[in-house]
UniProtKB/Swiss-Prot annotation:
Disulfide bonds: none annotated. HAMAP family: ATP_synth_b_bprime. This is ATP synthase subunit b 2. It comes from Marinomonas sp. (strain MWYL1). It is a single-pass membrane protein. F(1)F(0) ATP synthase produces ATP from ADP in the presence of a proton or sodium gradient. F-type ATPases consist of two structural domains, F(1) containing the extramembraneous catalytic core and F(0) containing the membrane proton channel, linked together by a central stalk and a peripheral stalk. During catalysis, ATP synthesis in the catalytic domain of F(1) is coupled via a rotary mechanism of the central stalk subunits to proton translocation. Component of the F(0) channel, it forms part of the peripheral stalk, linking F(1) to F(0). It is found in: Cell inner membrane. GO terms for cellular component: plasma membrane; proton-transporting ATP synthase complex.
Length: 156
């Protein structure tokens, strides 16, 4: 056999093999490589997206935490103000009650003093009439006695 014919046969066989590979083998391999490349790109994009989402979620979480702290501080401040207000109201109520009790006690004392003065006036007038009877040596009748006592009580 001739070397040229063998070489030509091998070249034709190689060309058929290349054509067969390009027609039937290469497209699935290229498709698999492209699919793999696309999956890798999608994975990288998903990782980037997840990273951005994580950063966004962390920012939102920190913002919510900050707002919660502000709300808690505001609620505590309002509670403290309300507690102080309640204490002030209680103090005012106690002061008002004390003043009212003091005034009531003062009024009761004044009434007791007035009653004591009235009783003292009555006793003084009785003693005065008794002394006057002894001095005069005569008895004054009850009607005249009560009129004089009332008149003296009014004058005193």
């Amino acid at each position: 056999m001739n070397l040229n014919l063998t070489l030509l046969g091998q070249a034709i066989s190689f060309a058929i093999f290349v054509w067969f590979c390009m027609k039937y083998v290469w497209p699935p391999v290229i498709a698999a490589l492209e699919e793999r490349s696309k999956k890798i790109a999608d994975g990288l994009e998903a990782a980037n997206r997840a990273s951005r989402d994580l950063e966004l979620a962390q920012e939102q979480a920190s913002q919510i935490l900050r707002e919660s702290k502000e709300n808690a501080a505001e609620i505590i401040e309002q509670a403290n103000k309300r507690a102080n207000q309640m204490v002030d109201e209680a103090k005012e109520q106690v002061i008002a009650d004390g003043k009212r009790l003091r005034e009531a006690a003062q009024a009761e004392i004044e009434q007791d003093v007035m009653r004591a003065k009235e009783a003292l006036r009555a006793q003084v007038s009785v003693l005065a009439f008794a002394g006057a009877e002894k001095i005069l040596g005569a008895t004054i009748d009850e009607k005249a006695h009560s009129e004089i006592v009332e008149q003296l009580a009014k004058e005193l």
